[in-house]
């Protein structure tokens, strides 16, 4: 049995900027995940369920657990003196860590994806993305350090809190998964170099918004529902409403996750920096593909911290089918 800590140290030589700091950074995220795991498991017993009464910068009502997870992860990263600053879905602006100007890395995160599902005991997750800063080491980080295209990520991953808690990450050398053993207090390696199955047969989308979708996406949904033996259609529809949970299932079973633009969200709804980029990095490392329907997610240069984007991620052939239909059936 190999622990996450042992595995990271063992694979450190594969990382082009190996200094030991990235190992410590991932350990800090691991600690934060353990704390969140502990409190999610007793969420119904303490007063951390429901809405907090506050709103984030996007105008969304923050759940109590959103704020709790954000503070715990922020504290875990700040305590190690290895991160110069963070950007979070729950913070209006970047958070500069004073006294950490010497640090080489910045972290972007969605502390608790799918938190509205907590009240009904459905899987949620944490998403993280790590970059090397671009401003000089020794100075305070600026927004420039965070507004980098996804192809500059040095590591990314997620934690899914479900029937078991799993941490999945990549440093650009494959995707690896670890299951948390609460009796030992450690994450243990359960899957190394994860890959999408050759063919996917599941599509994940909120079909309740069908009437609002672009024409190409509507055509793709119909394509998924058609009977066609050579392509093993119709596909199965599975949608949890938690990006981490839907992505994780499709990675294991084969499938595509779709969150297109709508009339009310013409640029898409998912955040490019906190959700799309890290999941796109993981998908490509697992042999999949991620697109906004027209271009590769990882090649998009962000313009703002909370920028949104349409998002299609999963098996190559499924994402390519969506892109093809979006091209063939443009909106008027």
UniProtKB/Swiss-Prot annotation:
User: What GO cellular component entries does it have?
Assistant: cytosol
Broad class of the protein's primary localization: cytoplasm
UniProt binding sites for substrate = 113-116, 206, 239, 257-259, 269
- Which Gene Ontology biological process is one annotated for this entry? gluconeogenesis
The cofactors named for this UniProt entry are: Mg(2+)
Q: Which InterPro entries match?
A: FBPase_C_dom (IPR044015), FBPase_class-1 (IPR000146), FBPase_N (IPR033391), FBPtase (IPR028343), Fructose_bisphosphatase_AS (IPR020548)
Annotated Mg(2+) 2 binding lies at 110, 113, 275
Q: Which reaction does it catalyse?
A: beta-D-fructose 1,6-bisphosphate + H2O = beta-D-fructose 6-phosphate + phosphate
Entry keyword set: Carbohydrate metabolism, Cytoplasm, Hydrolase, Magnesium, Metal-binding
Q: Where in the cell is it found?
A: Cytoplasm
Q: What class of enzyme is it?
A: hydrolase
Query: What does the record give under GO molecular function?
Result: fructose 1,6-bisphosphate 1-phosphatase activity; magnesium ion binding
| Metabolic or biological pathway, per its Swiss-Prot or TrEMBL entry | Carbohydrate biosynthesis; gluconeogenesis
Which CDD domains does UniProt cross-reference here?
FBPase
Query: For binding Mg(2+) 1, which residues are annotated in this chain's numbering?
Result: 89, 110, 112
For the keyword Phosphoprotein, the answer is no
Cofactor binding: number and manner: Binds 2 magnesium ions per subunit.
- Entry annotated with the keyword Magnesium: yes
**Record-listed E.C. numbers:** 3.1.3.11
Family to which this protein belongs: Belongs to the FBPase class 1 family.
Tell me the subunit arrangement: Homotetramer.
Protein name, entry field: Fructose-1,6-bisphosphatase class 1
Organism in which the protein naturally occurs: Enterobacter sp. (strain 638)
The organism's taxonomy opens as: Bacteria, Pseudomonadati, Pseudomonadota, Gammaproteobacteria, Enterobacterales
What gene does this protein come from?
fbp
């Amino acid at each position: 049995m190999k622990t996450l800590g042992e595995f990271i140290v063992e694979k450190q030589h594969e990382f082009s900027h190996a200094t030991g700091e990235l190992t410590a950074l991932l350990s800090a995220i691991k600690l934060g995940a353990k704390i969140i795991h502990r409190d999610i498991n007793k969420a119904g017993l303490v007063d951390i369920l429901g809405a907090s009464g506050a709103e984030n910068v996007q105008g969304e009502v923050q759940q109590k657990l959103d704020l709790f997870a954000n503070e715990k992860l922020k504290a875990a990263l700040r305590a190690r003196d290895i991160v110069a600053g963070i950007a979070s879905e729950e913070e209006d602006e970047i958070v500069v860590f004073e006294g950490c100007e010497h640090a080489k890395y910045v972290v972007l995160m969605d502390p608790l994806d799918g938190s509205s599902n907590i009240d009904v005991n459905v899987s949620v997750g944490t998403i993280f993305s790590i970059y090397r800063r671009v401003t000089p080491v020794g100075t305070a980080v600026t927004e420039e350090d965070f507004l980098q295209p996804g192809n500059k990520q040095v590591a990314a991953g997620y934690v899914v809190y479900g029937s078991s808690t799993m941490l999945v990450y990549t440093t650009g050398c494959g995707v690896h998964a670890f299951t948390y053993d609460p009796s030992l207090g450690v994450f243990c390696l359960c899957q190394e170099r994860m890959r999408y199955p050759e063919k996917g047969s599941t599509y994940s989308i909120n079909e309740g918004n069908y009437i609002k979708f672009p024409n190409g996406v509507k055509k793709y949904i119909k394509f998924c529902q058609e009977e066609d033996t050579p392509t093993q259609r119709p596909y199965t529809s599975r949608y949890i409403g938690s990006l981490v949970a839907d992505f994780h299932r499709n990675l294991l079973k084969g499938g595509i996750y779709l969150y297109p633009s709508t009339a009310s969200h013409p640029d898409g709804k998912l955040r490019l920096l906190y959700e799309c980029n890290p999941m796109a990095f993981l998908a490509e490392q697992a042999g999949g593909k991620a697109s906004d329907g027209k271009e590769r997610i990882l090649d998009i240069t962000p313009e703002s911290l909370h920028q949104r984007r349409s998002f299609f991620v999963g098996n190559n052939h499924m994402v390519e089918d969506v892109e093809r239909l979006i091209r063939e059936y443009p909106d008027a």
